[in-house]
Structures are given as structure tokens and as C-alpha cells.
A protein has these predicted regions:
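Short, charged low-complexity intrinsically disordered segments located at boundaries
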Residues: 58-62, 89-96, 165-169
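Catalytic donor/gating beta->alpha subdomain of glycosyltransferases that bind UDP-sugars
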Residues: 6-9, 14-75, 157, 162-164
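Membrane-embedded multi-pass helical conduit in multi-pass membrane proteins
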Residues: 75-155
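Conserved beta strand-loop-helix elements of the APE1-like EEP
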Residues: 2-4
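Membrane-proximal soluble regions of multi-pass membrane proteins
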Residues: 25, 36-41, 46, 129-169
Length: 169
């Protein structure tokens, strides 16, 4: 997140979000309350956080996914349903369905892949990787369910050596 130092001071500085599990979202909410914000992609900025292993990505998502859903079982159910309908059912229909179901699945899968290609191009990734979007979404679905499960056990938000998320209700 790029911002001016005086703008950060105006919203209370880092102290204002010190206890937030998802600090970038908490900071964005502080700025959003003051007016419009711009979210965008650029070639000129690179992340300094490294996620070299699959488990690093899983832990990063699991750490905060259920918190992002407000620890709400209803929002979790909605997110699961949306991910299944949008990303999982189309390729299953394309590969295992027949007739109209297969055509619908192929069309939906092709559309999601085509819409993902511009993002892949920004990061210099082969457009063929767009075909993996359903598998990526399914992985995120599993990470989100793990996040909820860990929160319900009082072990959510593990970050920097401690459990930081509140216990799910």
C-alpha cells in the first residue's frame, strides 16, 4: 500500500490499526472513511513478501480469510457457495457432463480463463495458466474452510508466532 506520510498521520498512524489482524484492510477502511480511494495494479511496484512454498500461501490465506468474512458462518456459507458455483462446477460440468451441461461448463470455463489473461499478462505469466483458475479457486476455498475451522478451535490468525484472531462464535 502506497500512501503519503501526512495522510497516514491524519488517520491516526500505525497505532490506529495496531491490533488489526488484516492491517492493510484496516488501513484501507480508515482512508475509505475519508473519501474515495484508488485500487490498482502497476508494473512499478514489487512485493517484498516472499511465498516460495505452497504452504506459505496456504498459511497466508488461512491466517485471515475467516476474519475477512467477519467470523460469520452465514458469510462463510455464501462464500463457499459462490466459489463452487463460479469456479468449481463449470470445469466439473465441462469434464464430466454431457450435452448442454458440458457446453455450459466449457463456455463458463473459457470465459473465466479469458477474463484472467490480462492479469496474467501484467505479471508476465503464460496465458495458459488461466486454465488453472478453477484449481486455484478450489485451493482458496480449502484455505478459507481451514481458516474457519482453526478460528472455531480458537487457533485462528496464527501470525508472528501467536494466535491473533478472536475465537469464532
Amino acid at each position: 500500500m502506497l500512501l503519503r506520510a501526512n495522510a497516514l498521520r491524519d488517520v491516526g498512524g500505525i497505532e490506529a490499526i495496531r491490533d488489526a489482524l488484516i492491517d492493510d484492510c484496516a488501513l484501507a477502511r480508515k482512508f475509505k472513511a475519508r473519501g474515495p480511494i484508488w485500487l490498482g495494479l502497476t508494473h512499478r511496484v514489487a512485493s517484498i513478501r516472499s511465498y516460495p512454498r505452497w504452504t506459505d500461501i496456504a498459511q497466508m490465506v488461512s491466517r485471515s480469510a475467516y476474519a475477512q468474512l467477519g467470523y460469520s458462518p452465514g458469510q462463510l456459507a455464501g462464500a463457499v457457495l459462490a466459489l463452487l458455483l463460479t469456479f468449481v462446477i463449470p470445469p466439473v460440468a465441462a469434464l464430466a457432463g454431457s450435452g448442454d451441461a458440458r457446453l455450459f461448463g466449457l463456455g463458463a470455463w473459457a470465459m473465466m480463463a479469458l477474463l484472467f489473461v490480462p492479469t496474467l499478462r501484467i505479471y508476465g505469466i503464460s496465458p495458459l495458466c488461466a486454465l488453472a483458475l478453477p484449481a486455484i479457486a478450489f485451493a482458496y476455498l480449502m484455505f478459507t474452510l481451514d481458516s474457519a475451522f482453526q478460528s472455531m478451535r480458537g487457533r485462528g490468525g496464527f501470525w508472528k508466532g501467536r494466535f491473533q484472531a478472536m475465537r469464532a462464535k
